């Protein structure tokens, strides 16, 4: 995908960049594969804020993505490549031989008219889904299952790719996009290739309004709040936080404390934690 940069006509366009969609990318979705999603604005069923800095944004229609890839041994043809407002990558509308239509994530390099299939004996080509046991070492994959039959949960973001680096017994060793090395059952399904739009991180938002269109509200620093609102608040003028270590708004240690639960079932499956830990 091409990233187009604006000239500094106004303060909002200075250093701002947007994605320039190609002619093959369409945005009108299939009605039967969509449903309206209520914007909860970060509130729970009682109206209490459970996730801060969310609200507003443009209305979206959710596209049902086939993360399961459970159409076994039935070939499909890529009919369209479409824009999805709910994710940074594109999605592909696939026409299967039995007449069913489904959306899948857009693999890098996939073109309109290409065929895909989900099978244990599928060829090693971009867009095909098959178990890890039938993939050679070094294969680039995405949309990886953690539990067999549950659907892909790993490496689904724009530009994400995981690699098979070893196999032993019933488990395969994968290097995930975060740098984490993890063991996964070889019965799990994965899709070959890299997720499209690998330049998503190179876009510059440029102005506050673009963030509001995405449904993201401003983040206020705790040091400029009142003491009743944040442990860092208060003081005369510009003052330090007045603590030995930074705290969250609820008084818990921040910036460096590990938040992963102890004695989690997957601890024995993680060979090496991701880079930022």
From Swiss-Prot:
The keyword Ribosomal protein applies. Pfam families: Ribosomal_L2, Ribosomal_L2_C. Keywords: Chloroplast, Plastid, Ribonucleoprotein, Ribosomal protein. One of its GO terms (cellular component) is mitochondrial large ribosomal subunit. Residues 224-257 are annotated as: Disordered. GO terms for molecular function: rRNA binding; structural constituent of ribosome; transferase activity. Belongs to the universal ribosomal protein uL2 family. NCBIfam families: rplB_bact. Part of the 50S ribosomal subunit. This is Large ribosomal subunit protein uL2c.
């Amino acid at each position: 995908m091409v990233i187009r940069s604006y000239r500094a006509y106004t303060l909002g366009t200075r250093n701002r960049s947007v994605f320039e969609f190609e002619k093959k990318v369409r945005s009108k979705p299939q009605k039967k594969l969509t449903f309206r999603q209520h914007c909860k604005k970060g509130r729970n069923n009682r109206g209490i804020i459970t996730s801060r800095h969310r609200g507003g944004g443009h209305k979206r229609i959710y596209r049902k993505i086939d993360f399961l890839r459970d159409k076994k041994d039935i070939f499909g043809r890529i009919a369209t490549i479409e824009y999805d407002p709910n994710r940074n990558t594109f999605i592909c509308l696939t026409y299967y031989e039995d007449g069913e239509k489904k959306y899948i994530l857009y693999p890098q390099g996939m073109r309109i008219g290409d065929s895909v299939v989900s099978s244990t004996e599928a060829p090693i080509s971009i867009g095909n889904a098959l178990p890890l046991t039938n993939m050679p070492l070094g294969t680039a994959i995405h949309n990886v299952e953690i539990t067999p039959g549950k659907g892909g949960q790993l490496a689904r973001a724009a530009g994400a790719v995981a690699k098979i680096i070893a196999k032993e017994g019933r488990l395969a060793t994968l290097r995930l996009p975060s740098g984490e090395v993890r063991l996964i059952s070889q019965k799990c399904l994965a899709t070959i290739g890299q997720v499209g739009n690998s330049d998503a991180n190179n876009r510059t938002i440029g102005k506050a309004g673009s963030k509001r269109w995405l449904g993201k509200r401003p983040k206020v620093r705790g040091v400029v709040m009142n003491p009743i609102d944040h442990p860092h608040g208060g003081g005369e003028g510009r003052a330090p936080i007045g603590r030995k270590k930074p705290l969250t708004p609820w008084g818990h240690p921040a910036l460096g404390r590990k938040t992963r639960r102890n004695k989690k079932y997957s601890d024995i499956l993680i060979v090496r934690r991701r880079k930022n830990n």
